[in-house]
A protein has these predicted regions:
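Carbohydrate-interacting/catalytic domains
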Residues: 1-196, 201, 205-231, 293, ...
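Catalytic-core region of carbohydrate-active enzymes that cleave or remodel glycosidic bonds
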Residues: 391-406, 411, 431-507, 581, ...
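Active-site neighborhood of glycoside hydrolase catalytic domains
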Residues: 324, 347-414
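Aromatic- and acidic-residue-enriched carbohydrate-binding clefts of CAZyme catalytic domains
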Residues: 188-213, 241-289, 316-353, 512-523
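Short, acidic/polar
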Residues: 213-224, 351-366, 476-481
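Carboxylate/His-rich catalytic cores and anion/metal-binding grooves
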Residues: 226-250, 302, 307-322
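Hydrophobic faces of well-ordered beta-strands that scaffold small-molecule active sites
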Residues: 190-192, 233-235, 300-302, 374, ...
Length: 655
C-alpha cells in the first residue's frame, strides 16, 4: 500500500477540514501474484473511537483505490489506510472461472466453504453467522449442481456480508496521520472590515476639527453590516496610537496636532497591545460592541499587528525586543522603497521566551473579551516557529479560535504559515484578473493546497486598490465581488465598497485620503432608509444578494468542489460548484464577463456529468441575481456585461 493522499508533508502537519467537509482520499494497493486485495481507512475520532470506511478500486491498472472521508465533530482526528489480502475475493474470482470451466470444481467449492468457516471465527451478528452456515452447507451439498452450490457461496447477501465485515489477511497499515477538524467558520464566512474611528466620526464646523467615532458609535453600524448578510466584522487595530513620528494624511511625515495617525503604529503612554485607544472608549465599550455583534449574528475579528510605535511601553521596558543600529538608535520598519518611521518591528532573536510569553498573554486578554478570530498583519515577517507555538498553545484551551494570515508574500511562506496553524490566508486574488490566471489559481487552491490552506478573497482592502478597480467602473466592482463570493468559501469586503471608492493615491495601488491616516465620514445616513439618492452609486443591495445566495446554497460553502467550465470568449469565465449531502443536490454555475468595459456575447459549454446530469439532459437555469430563468443544456448562449448584468449566478433546477 503506497501513495496515500491527502498527506501534508508526509504527515508532519495535519490534514485540515471542517465538520461535514467531504475529503477525497486515495491510495495505491497491490500485492505480489494474483490474489485479490482490498483496502479501508480507519478514522479515529477525538474520543478514541474508530470508524472504518471501505475504499473502492477505481482504476485496476493503476492499483488505485478511493473513498471520501467526512468528520462529524471538531477535534484532533487521525486516519490510517490499511491494505490487505482478500481471501474471499480471491476465492470468488477463481471459483467463478474454474467452476464454469469445469476445472477443479469440488476442490474450489470446498475451498470456498473453508474460507466461509474462517469468517465464522470472527465476531458477527447471529443473522450473519446463520447466513454463512447456510452457504457453507450449500457449498458442500453434493446433491446440488455445482453452479447452484457456487451461487450459494457468492450470493449478493454473502458478498454484502464480506464487504461489511471482511476477512482480512496480511494487513499493511499506514501510520496514523493527523487530521485537524475545525468549526465551519474556519472555511466559510463573509467578512466586512471597518475602522471603528470612522464609524460615527464627523467634522465639527464650529471648531474646524474632526470628532472621532467610538466603539459605541461603531456598534450602530453593525445592524447594516448584518443586514447585508455578513458573518464576521473585522476591526482594524483599536489600541493606543503612538505620537512620535505620527503619520499625517496620505502617509505624510508631518502630522498635525489633531491628526489621528495610523492605528498600525501601536502604543503610547496610554498603553500597548493589551489596551484600547482612549478616544475609542473603554473595555466596557468593547464588551458592548462584541455583545451587540453577537446579538446580530456577527463574530468579531481583531487585527493583530506585532509592531510598535516609538512610544510603545515595550520600547522602554524591553529595548532588547528591537533591533539597535550602529548609531544606537532603534531601526524603524522598512520595505524598500517604503519606509515606516512611525513603526518599530519586533526582533525575536534576543529574548524569544520573553516575547512569546508576552504575546500569549496579550492574545488571552482579547480572547477573554470575546474575540475568537484574529487577522494577523504580516505574519511572514515573524518567525514561523513562533506562530506554530502560539496557535498550538491557544488551541489547547480555545480550539475555536481562528487565525487569518495577511501574508502577501512568496507561495512557500504562505503555504508554511497555513501548515503550522493559520486557518485562513489572504491570497493573490486582487491581482488575478485574466481568465487563465483565475482558472490556474483556482486549480491550485481547490486541489494542490486545499489540504492545509483555506483562501480568503478580497477585491479591495485598505491597502489594495488595483488598476482594474480604479478604472473598471461599476461592472468591475460587481464582477470582483461576485467572483470572490462564489469562487471560494471565505471572502471579505472593505467598507466603502458599497460606494465604489475607486480614486487612487497617485503612484500607488491604494485609495486617496487613505483611512489608515485620517477619519472618513461616509455619511451612511444619506443611504438609509430608502437607498441612495439620485445619481449616487450604491452596491449594498448587490452585496446583500450575494450573501443571501451564499447562505442559501451549500455548494458555495466548500472549496474542493470548484470545477472549470468552458466559454468560447476568453474574457468570459465559467465554472460550477456542486454539493450532494443526503437527499439534497445543490449545483451552481457562474458565468462572469471579466471585461468591465464591454458587453460580451458568447457560447458556454458545460461538462454535464460534473453537474450530476447526462450529456443530453436539459435543466432550468435560474439566475439568482435577476430572477430570470432559461432552458439550458450542454451548450448555451449568454450575454453578460455593462449593458446587462456582468455575472450570472445560475441555480441548476432539474426537470
Amino acid at each position: 500500500m503506497t501513495t496515500v493522499t491527502p498527506l501534508v508533508e508526509g504527515g508532519d502537519f495535519p490534514l485540515k477540514a471542517v465538520v461535514g467537509e467531504q475529503i477525497p482520499l486515495s491510495a495505491k494497493v497491490f500485492r505480489e501474484g494474483h490474489d485479490a486485495v482490498n483496502a479501508n481507512v480507519v478514522l479515529t475520532d477525538p474520543a478514541g473511537g474508530e470508524h472504518v470506511v471501505p475504499l473502492t478500486r477505481t482504476n485496476e491498472g493503476l492499483s488505485l483505490w478511493e473513498t471520501t472521508i467526512v468528520a462529524d465533530r471538531e477535534g484532533d482526528w487521525t486516519y490510517r489506510v490499511e491494505g490487505w489480502s482478500d481471501p474471499y475475493g480471491t476465492w470468488e474470482h477463481d471459483a467463478t472461472i474454474k467452476v464454469e470451466a469445469g476445472v477443479d470444481v469440488d476442490l474450489m467449492l470446498e475451498e470456498g466453504a473453508r474460507v466461509l468457516e474462517r469468517a465464522l471465527n470472527q465476531e458477527r451478528p447471529e443473522s450473519a453467522q446463520r447466513l454463512l452456515r447456510d452457504a457453507i452447507a450449500a457449498l458442500r451439498d453434493e446433491d446440488r449442481p455445482p453452479a447452484a452450490r457456487l451461487a450459494a457461496g457468492t450470493a449478493p447477501e454473502v458478498v454484502r456480508e464480506f464487504a461489511q465485515r471482511p476477512l482480512r489477511e496480511h494487513v499493511s497499515p499506514s501510520p496514523d496521520y493527523p487530521w485537524l477538524v475545525e468549526r465551519q467558520r474556519a472555511l466559510y464566512g463573509a467578512w466586512y472590515e471597518f475602522f471603528p474611528r470612522s464609524e460615527g466620526c464627523y467634522y465639527d464646523e464650529a471648531t474646524g476639527e474632526w470628532v472621532t467615532g467610538t466603539l459605541r458609535t461603531a456598534a450602530k453600524r453593525l445592524p447594516a453590516v448584518a443586514d447585508m448578510g455578513f458573518d464576521v466584522i473585522y476591526l482594524t487595530p483599536i489600541h493606543p496610537i503612538g505620537t512620535i513620528n505620527r503619520k499625517g494624511p496620505n502617509n505624510t511625515l508631518n502630522a498635525g496636532p489633531k491628526d489621528p495617525g495610523s492605528p498600525y503604529a501601536i502604543g503610547s503612554k496610554d498603553g500597548g497591545h493589551d489596551a484600547i485607544e482612549p478616544t475609542l472608549g473603554t473595555f466596557e465599550d468593547f464588551d458592548f460592541f462584541v455583545a451587540e455583534a453577537e446579538r446580530l449574528g456577527l463574530e468579531v475579528a481583531m487585527d493583530i499587528a506585532l509592531q510598535c510605535a516609538p512610544d510603545h511601553p515595550w520600547v522602554t521596558s524591553h529595548p532588547e525586543w528591537f533591533t539597535t543600529r550602529a548609531d544606537g538608535t532603534i531601526a524603524y520598519a522598512e520595505n524598500p522603497p517604503k519606509k515606516y518611521q512611525d513603526i518599530y518591528p519586533l526582533n525575536f532573536d534576543n529574548d524569544p521566551a520573553g516575547i512569546y510569553a508576552e504575546m500569549r498573554r496579550m492574545v488571552q486578554v482579547w480572547i477573554d473579551h470575546g474575540v475568537k478570530i484574529f487577522r494577523v498583519d504580516n505574519p511572514h515577517t515573524k518567525p514561523v516557529e513562533f506562530w506554530q507555538w502560539l496557535i498550538t498553545d491557544v488551541a489547547q484551551t480555545h480550539p475555536d479560535v481562528i487565525w487569518l494570515a495577511e501574508a502577501f508574500t512568496k507561495p512557500a511562506m504562505m503555504a508554511t504559515l497555513a501548515k503550522v496553524g493559520f486557518q485562513q490566508s489572504y491570497t493573490y486574488y486582487a491581482w488575478r484578473n485574466e481568465r487563465w490566471e483565475l482558472e490556474e489559481y483556482m486549480e491550485e487552491l481547490s486541489t494542490q493546497t486545499a489540504d492545509y490552506m483555506r483562501p480568503s478573497f478580497w477585491p479591495t482592502t485598505h491597502d489594495i486598490l488595483t488598476p482594474y478597480m480604479q478604472y473598471g467602473g461599476p461592472a468591475a466592482w460587481k464582477v470582483r465581488a461576485a467572483l470572490a463570493a462564489t469562487l471560494v468559501p471565505t471572502y471579505g469586503i472593505y467598507t466603502g465598497y458599497e460606494l465604489l471608492e475607486s480614486v487612487p493615491r497617485p503612484g500607488v495601488e491604494e485609495q486617496i485620503d487613505n483611512e489608515k491616516y485620517e477619519f472618513k465620514n461616509r455619511r451612511w445616513e444619506d443611504y438609509a432608509p430608502g437607498g441612495p439618492k439620485e445619481g449616487q452609486l450604491w452596491m449594498a443591495d448587490y452585496l446583500r444578494t450575494l450573501n443571501e445566495i451564499r447562505a442559501a446554497h451549500p455548494a458555495l460553502h466548500w472549496l474542493r468542489n470548484w470545477r472549470k467550465q468552458s466559454a468560447n470568449d476568453e474574457n468570459v469565465m465559467c465554472f460550477s460548484k456542486r454539493h450532494v449531502d443526503g437527499g439534497r443536490d445543490d449545483t451552481i454555475i457562474v458565468v462572469a464577463n471579466l471585461d468591465p468595459h464591454t458587453t460580451r456575447e458568447t457560447w458556454i459549454h458545460l461538462d454535464m456529468p460534473e453537474l450530476g446530469l447526462g450529456w443530453n439532459d436539459g435543466f432550468v437555469a435560474k439566475d439568482l441575481i435577476t430572477g430570470e430563468s432559461w432552458q439550458w443544456g450542454q451548450h448555451n448562449f449568454v450575454r453578460v456585461g455593462r449593458d446587462a448584468e456582468p455575472v450570472h449566478i445560475i441555480h441548476v433546477r432539474r426537470f
